[in-house]
Amino acid sequence: TSVVQRDKVGIGFNNIAYAYDINSKKPYRHIAVIPLDLNGNGKIDPEEDFYATSTELNAAIAEGKYPSPPARNLFLVSNGKPMKPEVLAFLEFILTDGQQYAPEVGYIGLSSDILEEELFKLQE
């Protein structure tokens, strides 16, 4: 981020967490988040203008307004069902209390349907 900030013609491709200040929720100084013209009409319409804060952008991603890609799902993969108690406890944490930390670091929390489905898989 700092290299792009110092280069007036610099361009960077990054995770939201690296473009927005975690405290102010606004883009870092000297960083401009370039919006996407989602409907291709050559301008950013009000319903496409959700880049002022990370809170607005995260909400747009969660609501499906921001496309995939560049927004995308992340998965954890294992070789068979995890059996170790500490691994199961970690996965349960991710799907419960850990969800509260997702927005702070530029991720979108999972929907209640997905959380329920994945927690059920841990119980099987």
Predicted regions and their residues:
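Exported/periplasmic ABC-transporter solute-binding proteins
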Residues: 1-124
